[in-house]
Amino acid sequence: MKRKIFFGLILTSSIILSGSSLTKQIIDDNKKPDVNSGVTNSNENNNNGNTFVPEDSDSIEDSNVNVTPPVDNKKTIFIYLNPSVQTKNFYYGNLGTEAQHMQDIAHIMYEELKDIPFIHVDCNTYFKTLSLKEAVAESNSKHRHIHFALHSNAGGGSGTEVYTKDSIEFATKMYNTFLTLGNFNKRGVKVQNTLYETNNSKAEHTALMEFLFHDRKDEALYLVNNKKTIANTMVKGLIEFINENYW
């Protein structure tokens, strides 16, 4: 992957460094829909008229996320990515499992984040496969600024939702970021203290994303065919959140 980190430079056409602000270059999002998020404790909006963007056309390597923190504030941000380990949750039409596809997305995110200066990222993926409790314990073993859990949903519904105990700003950021990819059913940001992961994570900001419903044909196909796009978009959301809250 070609990645260039620039300190104190002005790059024509792609990157603008203003004062001590964060420099970042992120993939362009064409034809972004307007997104209005809500914070709720129950499901909302049953519109099933989903419209999805095309399958991945460019690799993650061709869509760089370049970041240069300000020189005078080199705060290292610690992130933990925890994809689903649910190997028995099968996608529509035997297209794989929730664990398989969420780990794929998390691994791409990990590869994108690990080379960014002043970001330290851990990921419970292929080479670990920790249980849920083990992953939360590993996340809690050091101070984390961000804990992000990746899941797909089931049960006959449709659309996107995210759960959090008290990190509403972070959860809303990741929710809105994913919704830029298509006209998905907006199920909302759910404040809840009964999920083990969101309730027991000690990170400053914790959210559990349910991207789409994997038992629905169109949504399962979208997740399977657009993992690089999803990963890159979620990295974009993370970087923007870090920029807004830490750098």
Each predicted region: which residue ranges?
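Catalytic-core regions of hydrolytic enzymes
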Residues: 61-170
